[in-house]
Amino acid sequence: MSVQATLRGRRRAAGTLLAAGALALAACTPAGEGDGDTSGEPDASGAAGTTQLSIATGGTGGVYYPLGGGFATVIGEQVDGYSATVSETNASVDNMQLIGDGGADLALVLGDTAADAVNGEADFEGAPVTACALGRLYDNYTQIVTSADSGITSIEDMEGASVSLGSPGSGTEIIALRILEAAGIDPDSGISRQQLGVAETVEALRDGTIDAGFWSGGLPTGALVDYATTGEMVLIPHGEYATVMQEAYGAYYTETEIPADTYEGQDEAISVVVVPNVLVANPDNMDEGLQEQITAAIFDSREQLTEVHPAAADLDPATAGEVEYMDICPGSQAYFDGQ
């Protein structure tokens, strides 16, 4: 069955940096509470004399949430008249829907999900989303996790197992379904399909209620850092499927490696599929001047943001405008042109 039909050295510093990131977060709001229109005058939604922006992120156990909190901090510090808060969501699919319906002003999103959204494909079939990219951020590594005693050493070994494919409405779920398709496993009949976020996946692995789980995130991911300390975590290599996924869906899927020692007890590099992350906005709801100011605040603050999460070390204005699958926001392009 096709996925279209089915869907319709950093580890060591990670623990303290993720804790610091949590402390750096701006106040968190429920998904969908942004007004989605930042083209007008400041209003009373933020501090006195400021307009409050909503940033759609992901679950608290991943990278989007703390990094989005860092973005909120630098926006509040560097963009006059604006503050920002983060919203916990199921991540990429939810986030693009929030951008489309005005429920969020900014969102962190996987590149493949963003492409589906602007092209009206997969979960967005018949309902394309108007969006532009403020820039490419960092790569998401597909991390397929199991326990040492599961007997699973490859994707093929998952046949008949209980496997989490990520939260419903997440970019992880899209990637998981496409990897299984590339491996010839039907996600509806070939596995016992579960839908859990990364923190819940780790809990279920510890409890023995699932055999394996998919997660797409930056390196290192906090929930996996914690799980690796038990000595039970095993990462499953799968980078060989990147070529098939490129041919079927697009060039944003590539093969790379999770470096050895990214997680405790991980002695060897692991071949995986990666996909870039982008920060997106709705150009109908955000003027070019604000786009440029936000882009500058984020990409000029790489060192500060790296203290929130190590993935921010990959923020690079020299390559951030290289987004082939959707338009760059014109204000962001102006910033990149000036570098």
What is the predicted function of each stretch?
Residues 29-32:
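Bacterial signal peptide processing site
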Residues 161-178, 252-324:
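Ligand-binding clefts/hinges and TM-proximal coupling segments of bilobed small-molecule sensing domains
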Residues 200, 207, 217-235, 240, ...:
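An extracytoplasmic/periplasmic, membrane-proximal ligand-sensing/linker region
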Residues 69-74, 85-127, 144, 199-204, ...:
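Pocket-flanking alpha-helical
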Residues 52-78, 82-86, 139-207, 322, ...:
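Bilobed "Venus flytrap"/periplasmic-binding protein-like clamshell domains
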Residues 2-18:
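Bacterial N-terminal signal peptides that target proteins for export
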Residues 24-27:
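C-terminal motif of bacterial Sec signal peptides marking the signal peptidase cleavage site
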